[in-house]
Amino acid sequence: SDEALLKISRDGMLALNLEEMTKLQAHANDAEVQQIRAGVGLGSELTDVELEALAQTWSEHCKHKIFSARIEYEDDQGNQEVINSLFKSYIMKVTADVRKARGKDDICLSVFKDNAGVIKFNDDWSLVYKVETHNSPSALDPYGGALTGIVGCNRDPFGTGMGARLMFNTDVFCFASPFYDKPLPPRLLHPRRIFEGVVEGVEHGGNKSGIPTVNGSLVFDDRFAGKPLVYCGT
């Protein structure tokens, strides 16, 4: 039943909605899938490991479902707009427009295709660059969230093309004031704890991988009390 599917999602903390759980159920019940599973010695039901793996790869953190969704937006003036994928409309399109405008002077060699972006540096060398945010993980576990963020940035240039040589890390951090003295909602860590944990996590992640952090920026604004910006790159 629908309730049974939702219970599986809740009990396993899969964070999958009914539509997603129904898709998994239909896949598992497909006759061809059942035959393949039997051929490799798997049972008819999805295992806990399979459910967990699918839930992780379908999570907002990995899949960016909000970025890909159809969004109906209305501003404070009453103007309405339907956006089919924020990512395609406002990130990929802007990049494509800039590349088109530059024409033969476009230096982009690989964009939105591999694990990191690649631009032409000179006739002999290309520059590989990967940046990403790790905001929610760092809000929950500042040290671990920041460390996994920076080593993920280390990992991706390694896996771009035939592999890149890593040179340095960079970062931008935005936090509420470390002297913040207003009430915080339940489960939110104090900005000072987030600040100190994030800085240490990025430092350890880079140094223990042998990749120095050569520059960075700090911004303090109390609007970041709800969620910090932890923006790292390699």
Describe every region a protein language model picked out:
Residues S1-T234:
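Core nucleic-acid recognition elements
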